[in-house]
Amino acid sequence: MSQLDLGTQSLELERFPPQENSNTLQAWEAADEYLLQNIDLSQIDGRPVLVFNDQFGTLACALHAYRPFSSSDSYMSQLATAHNLRLNHLDESAVTLLSSVDDLPEAPKLVVIKIPKALALLEHQLRALRRVVAPDTVIIAGAKSRDVHNSTLQLFEKILGPTKTTLAWKKARLIHCEVADIPLADAPETIDWPLPNTDYIIHNHANVFSRNNLDIGARFFMEILPYDVTGKIADLGCGNGVVGLIALEQNPLAEMLFVDESYMAVASSELNITVNRPQDLSRCEFMVSHGLAGVERESLQLVLCNPPFHQQHAVSDHVAWQMFCDAKRCLKAGGELMIVGNRHLDYFHKLKRLFGNCETLDSNQKFMVLKSVKQASSRSEGGGSGSLDMSYSDF
């Protein structure tokens, strides 16, 4: 937990999900401070205030008195925003949480943007803004200086209007943009490409990992996916759903759950099944969730996972660890977790400690595919759909 002093208010902010041994990672950054110092609150006239990509809810908490709309592709960021509003005893209902696929409010007076990691997501958001902004909408964006490039400024200028940047402050930089009536060619909502060695066409929304081609880890994983599994299979952290798509084809008696914390990932997965295997839609469920938090314990036969080892710009295997613990809770006795991961992450020993067993199914110079089986003697993980009661530090 860290404290952000804004002069007129002080906020206690925490990263989400809460992590042990995370004292070096705070829930806000200099760009948040810089943005809040440079917003002229006197300009807010009762029209909507709109915030984008507020990772842990810092901006929403600071601007809660103006009842902001907060748009994000990340369900985890939405949970973090709600968590930090509660932590500061602020009214959760004062902030309207929007997903990246929701419509934006018309004619906002103030738009505050944290520059996202993916330039394609920024372009999507700026194009969505163009459809709703008014001539007097105030637009201000911020990021670490290293993340504000000429291409970033050019996007603002091409889509919205004249753009200028500030001097750096604490290694952060701001962007000010004016709305202008400029011509702009249409752009498709998704991009598509053929999936190698299949007849499938993959469609990706803006914020999907490895948007322009097949992720090399997924490619390696897909080569050894099992056949003829019965019961329910989860593609955990599904991205665009390519792993689940192949699993769906190879396991005609199974049901498939696609789950991710990215709204655009889940939307892409659903689109890819609809386009490529419409006959199998009745066997599929699509869920935006924090891991398997919404899934009943001991309900899955197989969990497939290509876990992330970053949370935005921070390197961390905490999210992957939560996925593994969730998988153990949700697997039936005898059910299997199969993962693909970079060799240097040492998932083998973590899974062996958690499940009591781990097998290397395949490996190359960069990746390993591992399998763990849930034993019938595994200790009870509790009921309902909560997380496994086990600390990361235990391992």
Curated annotation (Swiss-Prot):
One example GO MF annotation: rRNA (guanine-N2-)-methyltransferase activity
Subcellular location: Cytoplasm
Pfam families: MTS
GO biological process terms held by the UniProt record: rRNA base methylation
GO cellular component, one term: cytoplasm
Keywords: Cytoplasm, Methyltransferase, rRNA processing, S-adenosyl-L-methionine, Transferase
Record-listed E.C. numbers: 2.1.1.174
Top-level taxon in the UniProt lineage: Bacteria
Catalytic activity field: guanosine(1835) in 23S rRNA + S-adenosyl-L-methionine = N(2)-methylguanosine(1835) in 23S rRNA + S-adenosyl-L-homocysteine + H(+)
Disulfide bonds: none
Alphabetical list of CDD domains matching this protein: AdoMet_MTases
Family indicated by similarity: Belongs to the methyltransferase superfamily. RlmG family.
Protein task: Specifically methylates the guanine in position 1835 (m2G1835) of 23S rRNA.
PANTHER family in UniProt: RIBOSOMAL RNA LARGE SUBUNIT METHYLTRANSFERASE G (PTHR47816:SF5), RIBOSOMAL RNA SMALL SUBUNIT METHYLTRANSFERASE C (PTHR47816)
HAMAP family: 23SrRNA_methyltr_G
Official protein name in the record: Ribosomal RNA large subunit methyltransferase G
Source organism phylogeny: Bacteria, Pseudomonadati, Pseudomonadota, Gammaproteobacteria, Enterobacterales
Encoding gene per record: rlmG
